[in-house]
């Protein structure tokens, strides 16, 4: 569960290393974001010649959470860290590579580009 002020790892090669959630999108009083939800982030740490710079405010989709996601068969998929993928204004990934595993739940949320770039889909 991601809320405001949560620090996330960035799981793509956009140039950002870490980001902070500043708003959970999808409703006026929505408090938490789960895997597949879109959030507003600010870049907290970036590499020198990346596509994004420190301090930029962008959209991102949550791809991994420590809380995990419950499947219909009762199993729970959990991860060791909270991670997101940076999106542009058209909600397409800024980076061209995705690092680490992602879940099948992104397919339901129409993020097929992220699923095709990911090295492992759980």
Curated annotation (Swiss-Prot):
One of its GO terms (biological process) is translation. CDD domains: Ribosomal_uL14. One of its GO terms (molecular function) is large ribosomal subunit rRNA binding. SMART domains: Ribosomal_L14. GO terms for cellular component: cytosolic large ribosomal subunit. Keywords: Ribonucleoprotein, Ribosomal protein, RNA-binding, rRNA-binding. Binds to 23S rRNA. Forms part of two intersubunit bridges in the 70S ribosome. Belongs to the universal ribosomal protein uL14 family. Part of the 50S ribosomal subunit. Forms a cluster with proteins L3 and L19. In the 70S ribosome, L14 and L19 interact and together make contacts with the 16S rRNA in bridges B5 and B8. This is Large ribosomal subunit protein uL14. It comes from Buchnera aphidicola subsp. Schizaphis graminum (strain Sg). The gene is rplN.
């Amino acid at each position: 569960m991601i809320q405001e002020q949560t620090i996330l790892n960035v799981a793509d090669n956009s140039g950002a290393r870490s980001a902070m959630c500043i708003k959970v999108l999808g409703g006026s009083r929505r408090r938490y974001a789960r895997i597949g939800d879109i959030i507003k982030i600010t870049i907290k740490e970036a590499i020198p010649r990346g596509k994004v710079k420190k301090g930029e405010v962008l959209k991102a989709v949550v791809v991994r959470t420590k809380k995990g996601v419950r499947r219909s068969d009762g199993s729970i998929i959990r991860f060791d860290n909270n991670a997101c993928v940076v999106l542009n204004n058209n909600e397409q990934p800024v980076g061209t590579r995705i690092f680490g595993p992602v879940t099948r739940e992104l397919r339901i949320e129409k993020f097929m580009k992220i699923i095709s770039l990911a090295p492992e889909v759980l």
